[in-house]
Amino acid sequence: MLKKIIILFLGVFVLSGCTDSFRGYFQKSANNRLVDSKGFKGGKRKPLYNNKYISLAKKNIVEDNLDDPEDDDDDYDNPLRGEQIDPVKRNREIYLKMIRRDMEKYKAESGESSDDDDMTLSKANKKVRKDNTDKERKMQEELDQIKAMLRETKRDISKYTCPNATANQNYVPPVSNYEPVAPVKNNKPYNNNSKVKQKFIREDDDYSSNACSI
C-alpha cells in the first residue's frame, strides 16, 4: 500500500511538469523561498528585483539621465505601433510611482503635510523666528546656569578666609603720639685736661697749618 502511494505521488509530480500553471506554483518567491505567504500580492508573486538596481533606476529618473532607444524605421510604418506597450515608458512610470510613494512615506514620517511642497515667504519667516526664539531660549538657559554657578562659588568663598588674614590677638598698634621729653642736662663739667681732648686739638692745629702752606 505504501509503495502505491509513493508511486502515485511521483506520477502526479512528473505529470505536473507538463502544465505551466501547476509548475509555476512551485517556483520560488521574491524572498527566495518555496512557500512564502509574503511573496504574494493580489494573487501574483512579487518580482525578484535587486534593490541596488532599483535605487540606481530611481536616481536616473530623478536626474533625467535616461538612455531612450532610437525608434527603428521599420516599426515607424507599423499600424500597430501605437497599440504596442513601450517597455521603457512602462518601467519609467513604475519607478516614478515608487519615487512618489517614497516621498509620501518620507513626508508622513517627518510630519510634513502634502501642502508644504512650496515654501512661501510667510512660512520661511515663521521658521526663522522659531529658530531665533529657540536660540535665545538656549542662551538664556546657559546664562542662568552661569549665574547660578557664580552665586554658588561666592557662597563657598565666603565660608573660608585666608589664614594670613586672621586677627592676631596679641597685636598692638604702634604709638604715634609721643610726648616731648626734656633734654638731659649733664651736671659734670668738661675735663679740659683730658688726653683724648688734647690729642684732637693738636690734630686740628696740624691740619690747619698744612692747609695754609698749600
UniProtKB/Swiss-Prot annotation:
GO annotations of cellular component type: plasma membrane
Coiled-coil regions listed in the entry: 120-162
Disordered as annotated region, ranges: 64-83, 106-138, 166-197
Compartment annotation: Cell membrane
Residue stretches of biased makeup (Acidic residues): 64-77
Signal peptide region: 1-17
Sites of N-palmitoyl cysteine lipidation: 18
Lipidation (S-diacylglycerol cysteine): 18
Record's bilayer topology term: Lipid-anchor
Keywords annotated in UniProt: Cell membrane, Coiled coil, Lipoprotein, Membrane, Palmitate, Signal
Protein name stated in the entry: Uncharacterized lipoprotein RBE_0877
Lineage: Bacteria, Pseudomonadati, Pseudomonadota, Alphaproteobacteria, Rickettsiales
